[in-house]
């Protein structure tokens, strides 16, 4: 049995310091900087945030009206299991309601799958490197071995190495498509082939948080194929194309029997009543959703062209963000450019946390934000 970690010299009571070693060594998730932080730090009145892959159009008008209409219900507990939201998701995505697991963001579903599938001291979990940090954070917090497989130099998936890292004790394998932070998006046939090659007891979790932004989602999403592959689960979120990042709402789709196990251990009422109403309204407002996709795809084309023209190495993206490396003759490194943009009121994402210190990631904004970013960025490149 693993002994609790103790910090003898901390001066704190042992009841406080005798904690699990996984917690003592835990490094929490590092979120992007907020607009208020930068305003206060640099004394700015206006700040443009292009770091957290949020919706460039904000929140749907129908969602806003729905929240106003139902605000007086905030004192009520939500109906257990969110059946109305589950039904709306099932209709919108063409899946069986009994296969849907809703969560307080897709992060909660990630955590639940790990807890349900992986046993500490026995199982392992496999993902690519770099990957979304929540896969590693929650795996290590649960005391489970976390294995990572390097991406290829062009950030495509090395499937042979990935399958080679898995064994009979691999409980879960995570992939993200489109991938974060590169935006790489493989054809669905490759994901299906991977599902066939993994050990039979391994659950392949395909995180499709950014799938809506692909030019042709049907060519890349495994969601329509789930009934053929009981060893695959798909994650989706309302944070990106549906504009509900602040309400924390996501879901997973998986085999009904697995969904039942996951729902058994989910904390009650983890989705609040207003988030449920907002999620249903977001699915209903198809006009806003379509406009979001159009603006994002147009902005992605514009930023890709402008950054390429500026001499950057731009990695092809199917998501609502772009990863790029600075021109070879740039007088600044990536960290310096990030900090200089902060002082000018523009927040993008440095990628040192992904072990990519030479790269930056910019979220697609609206037209004004995109043009402002490019103007300020080019001015920095001129020294």
Curated annotation (Swiss-Prot):
Transmembrane segments: none annotated. Its EC number is 2.6.1.9. Pathway: Amino-acid biosynthesis; L-histidine biosynthesis; L-histidine from 5-phospho-alpha-D-ribose 1-diphosphate: step 7/9. Pfam families: Aminotran_1_2 (PF00155). The modification N6-(pyridoxal phosphate)lysine is found at residue 240. Gene3D superfamilies: Aspartate Aminotransferase, domain 1, Type I PLP-dependent aspartate aminotransferase-like (Major domain). It comes from Oleidesulfovibrio alaskensis (strain ATCC BAA-1058 / DSM 17464 / G20). NCBIfam families: hisC. The lineage of its organism: Bacteria, Pseudomonadati, Thermodesulfobacteriota, Desulfovibrionia, Desulfovibrionales. Its cofactor is pyridoxal 5'-phosphate. CDD domains: AAT_like. PANTHER family: HISTIDINOL-PHOSPHATE AMINOTRANSFERASE, HISTIDINOL-PHOSPHATE AMINOTRANSFERASE 2. Belongs to the class-II pyridoxal-phosphate-dependent aminotransferase family. Histidinol-phosphate aminotransferase subfamily. GO terms for biological process: L-histidine biosynthetic process. PROSITE patterns: AA_TRANSFER_CLASS_2. It catalyses: L-histidinol phosphate + 2-oxoglutarate = 3-(imidazol-4-yl)-2-oxopropyl phosphate + L-glutamate. It is an enzyme of class 2 (transferase). HAMAP family: HisC_aminotrans_2 (MF_01023). This is Histidinol-phosphate aminotransferase. GO terms for molecular function: histidinol-phosphate transaminase activity; pyridoxal phosphate binding. Homodimer. Keywords: Amino-acid biosynthesis, Aminotransferase, Histidine biosynthesis, Pyridoxal phosphate, Transferase.
């Amino acid at each position: 049995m693993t002994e609790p970690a103790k910090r003898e010299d901390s001066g704190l009571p042992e009841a406080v310091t005798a904690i699990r070693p996984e917690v003592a060594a835990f490094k929490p998730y590092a979120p992007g900087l907020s607009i208020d932080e930068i305003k206060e730090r640099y004394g700015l009145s206006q700040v443009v945030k292009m770091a957290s892959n949020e919706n460039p159009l904000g929140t749907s008008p129908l969602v806003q009206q729905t929240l106003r209409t139902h605000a007086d219900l905030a004192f009520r507990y939500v109906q257990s299991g969110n059946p109305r939201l589950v039904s709306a998701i099932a209709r919108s995505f063409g899946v069986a309601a009994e296969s849907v697991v809703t969560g307080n963001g897709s992060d909660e579903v990630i955590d639940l799958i790990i807890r349900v599938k992986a046993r500490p001291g026995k199982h392992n979990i496999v993902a690519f490197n770099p990957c979304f940090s929540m896969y590693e954070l929650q795996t290590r917090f649960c005391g489970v071995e976390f294995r990572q497989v390097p991406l290829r130099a062009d950030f495509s998936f090395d499937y042979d190495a990935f399958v080679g890292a898995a064994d009979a004790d691999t409980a879960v394998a995570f992939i993200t498509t489109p991938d974060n932070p590169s935006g790489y998006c493989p054809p669905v046939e490759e994901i299906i082939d991977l599902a066939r090659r993994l050990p039979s007891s391994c659950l392949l979790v395909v995180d499709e948080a950014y799938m809506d932004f692909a030019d042709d989602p049907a060519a890349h999403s495994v969601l329509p194929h789930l009934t053929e592959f009981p060893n695959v689960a798909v994650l989706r979120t309302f944070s990106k194309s549906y504009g509900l990042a602040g309400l924390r709402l996501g879901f997973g789709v998986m085999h009904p029997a697995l969904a039942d196990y996951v729902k058994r251990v989910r904390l009650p009422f983890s989705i609040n009543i207003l988030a449920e109403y907002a999620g249903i309204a977001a699915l209903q407002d198809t006009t806003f959703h379509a406009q979001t996709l159009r603006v994002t795809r147009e902005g992605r084309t514009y930023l890709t062209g402008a950054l390429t023209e500026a001499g950057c190495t731009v990695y092809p993206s199917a998501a609502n963000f772009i990863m790029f490396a600075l021109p070879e003759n740039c007088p600044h490194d990536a960290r310096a450019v990030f900090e200089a943009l902060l002082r000018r009121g523009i927040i993008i994402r440095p990628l040192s946390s992904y072990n990519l210190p030479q790269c930056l990631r910019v979220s697609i904004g609206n037209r004004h934000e995109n043009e402002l970013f490019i103007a300020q960025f080019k001015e920095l490149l001129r020294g």
